[in-house]
Amino acid sequence: MMERMGYALILVDVQRNMLVGDTAVDGAAEFTGVLTGLLDAARDAGAAVIHVKNDGRRGDPDEPGAPGWELVFTPLPGEPVVRKDVPNAFESNPALADVLRAMGVDTVVVAGLQSEYCVQATAVGALERGFDVVVPAGAHTTYDDGEPATAIVERVTLELIAAGVAVPELDEVTFG
């Protein structure tokens, strides 16, 4: 029988195309530092870590096999890499919820990119499957798209709170 972990960190689309080089989001270095802190905290606490990797379409910067498709953080042994081709990682991977439950996870901490697409969809997907969901303030970002990225992040944060997602400050996040 596996020991109950309780918590999992789901890193959504933390791939080179959005965090390295010309196609990176604004503030990519600082944001990568935020994610590094969350990842270190999760690993130190013995929480499950799931790396979600988007499979872009042919010609996209995150097309499978392209340099931008590669993960920024190297998964450790026992940290699954889950591929997806729609925004919600749970929709692309129907067994993901069962895998998390088998690991004893009841709370998922979701972080990564992009706020209004894959982060929001995956967080809501986790809620719909009965998990407690945490999306730390400052742990998701996006690009300017008709409005500044900061405005998009703020709007998504309010929508997540309205949906029932906990949005603590980064320094309040624990994995146990």
What are the language-model segments listed below?
Residues 1-8, 34-43, 62-176:
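Active-site-adjacent betaalpha module
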Residues 10-14:
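N-terminal nucleotide-binding beta1-loop-alpha1 segment
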Residues 15, 55, 85:
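Anionic group-transfer/hydrolysis microenvironments
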Residues 15-21:
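Short acidic, Gly/Ser-rich segments with clustered Asp/Glu that frequently serve as metal-coordination loops
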Residues 21-22, 61-63:
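Short, glycine/acidic-enriched capping/hinge loops at junctions between secondary-structure elements
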Residues 23-51:
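A short alpha/beta connector and helix-capping loop motif
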Residues 54-55, 113:
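Short, well-ordered beta-to-alpha junction loops that form the rim of enzyme active sites
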Residues 56-60:
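Glycine-rich, proline-tolerant flexible connector loops at the mouths of alpha/beta enzymes
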